[in-house]
Amino acid sequence: MKSINILSFLLLSSTLSLVAFARSFTSENPIVLPTTCHDDDNLVLPEVYDQDGNPLRIGERYIINNPLLGAGAVYLYNIGNLQCPNAVLQHMSIPQFLGEGTPVVFVRKSESDYGDVVRVMTVVYIKFFVKTTKLCVDQTVWKVNDEQLVVTGGKVGNENDIFKIMKTDLVTPGGSKYVYKLLHCPSHLGCKNIGGNFKNGYPRLVTVDDDKDFIPFVFIKA
């Protein structure tokens, strides 16, 4: 009988301890879990680096290049003789698609606590750095159209035209470990990787739903 009483006492003590523990974490005293959100003031996001290991900087010119064998740099092209070229393509080791990339600059809507350094998974707008007419001066910022194609015609500050850069684990054939992927991240939706697809005979940049499907990129100072 004594052993039963001792067991009952232990069970009751354990129950009361659990109740007290649970009550100590109310809405007024919540459990704070670790976070990886870039809004956490205590988290310093890694810098994005160019192919040579230098930090990517806002306003400076870069070539966005696919380092894989047979692939090439991103460039601006005119499909259909439009007044303003708006197709964002990728050079390839095919005669009609050989060539140099078009320089881009990364810009922000306003000044940032990050200074002029681009950091992973922070908001940037991508803009081709090209000579253009007054008619097309506002047609150089990247966006994604209704066909999920990356085109120009976006606007700095438009929440639908936001891009972000994420580090990958890939290493280039030349040994560079600074390989990234681009994501389209409209504020009202989740991010989607930028991949590639032949559309009407052209190697287009497109958004893709599969998280494992993306084009790897390195950034080369122009």
Curated annotation (Swiss-Prot):
Belongs to the protease inhibitor I3 (leguminous Kunitz-type inhibitor) family. This is Cysteine protease inhibitor 1. Disulfide bonds join 84-136, 185-191. Potent inhibitor of cathepsin l (cysteine protease). Does not inhibit trypsin or chymotrypsin (serine proteases). May protect the plant by inhibiting proteases of invading organisms. It is found in: Vacuole. It holds the Pfam family Kunitz_legume. A motif (Vacuolar targeting signal) lies at residues 29-34. Residues 1-26 form the signal peptide. Keywords: Disulfide bond, Protease inhibitor, Signal, Thiol protease inhibitor, Vacuole. Tubers, leaves. It comes from the Eukaryota. Induction: By wounding. Also expressed in upper non-wounded systemic leaves. One of its GO terms (molecular function) is cysteine-type endopeptidase inhibitor activity. GO terms for cellular component: vacuole. InterPro entries: Kunitz_inhibitor_STI-like_sf (IPR011065), Prot_inh_Kunz-lg (IPR002160). The keyword Disulfide bond applies. Residues 27-42 form a propeptide.
